[in-house]
Regions:
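Helical hairpin unit composed of two closely spaced alpha helices linked by a short loop
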Residues: 145-147
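Short, small-residue-biased leader/transition segments that mark boundaries at the very start
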Residues: 1-6
Length: 203
């Protein structure tokens, strides 16, 4: 689920460039404006290799592979961008659809560490529309790594160019795919609520 909750933390930091240590490694972040509301994040390189994701079975790239979820067959592409994602391309991209399918994808035996799901529609060569089911959290209106995973899968399949706008209920994120495979995510942060955090949280 949340090994790489980068966008949630960025609104608290005002340095121009900085690193964030996550459960999946060090993430390099650049603040793009003086108000600290827009950030560019180096997510690293995705892997479609089953043992990296992980997906059970022989070691292979999990590209447009047939899976059965809740008695129905789907073609899915799976990858990791620091956490595991299953991408299903469909014309029916709705909250209801991902809520109905998400629990079955998350908990299938073929995904030993459970799985995040994005159902995705190619709008054109530069735009995708997604809905998100996050393992351990359920329906989610926005996900940075989910957007990166959907864009990387679409790019791998030749559906999009190297710059992709990923549209989700919580807003749009711009994804840039570099020639060496590195993913850059550019997005904004906004005020949601005031919270209190114990000092021990940071120790």
């Amino acid at each position: 689920g949340s090994e790489m909750c980068i966008r949630d933390s960025n609104g608290y930091i005002t340095e121009k460039k900085f690193d964030i240590e996550t459960m999946s490694g060090t993430i390099h972040v650049e603040c793009l404006n003086s108000r600290a509301t827009e950030f560019k994040v180096n997510i690293g390189k995705p892997s479609f290799i089953s043992s990296d994701i992980p997906v059970s079975g022989e070691v292979r790239e999990v590209i447009k592979e047939n899976f059965v979820f809740h008695g129905k067959e789907y073609k899915a592409t799976c990858l990791t961008v620091g956490n595991p994602h299953c991408i299903i391309f469909t014309d029916n991209v709705s909250a209801e659809a991902v809520k109905n399918l998400g629990p079955y994808v998350e908990n299938t035996d073929e995904f030993p560490e459970r799985m995040n799901l994005q159902i995705c529609r190619q709008v054109d060569k530069g735009n995708l529309e997604i809905q998100i089911w996050e393992r351990g959290s359920g329906y989610t209106k926005a996900s940075g790594t989910g957007s990166c995973a959907a864009a990387a899968a679409a790019y791998k399949l030749g559906l999009v160019e190297s710059r992709i706008n990923v549209n989700q209920p919580g807003g749009m994120i711009q994804i840039d795919m570099e020639e060496d495979g590195t993913i850059y995510m550019t997005g904004t942060v906004g005020y949601i609520a005031d919270i209190s955090v114990a000092e021990s949280f940071f120790s």
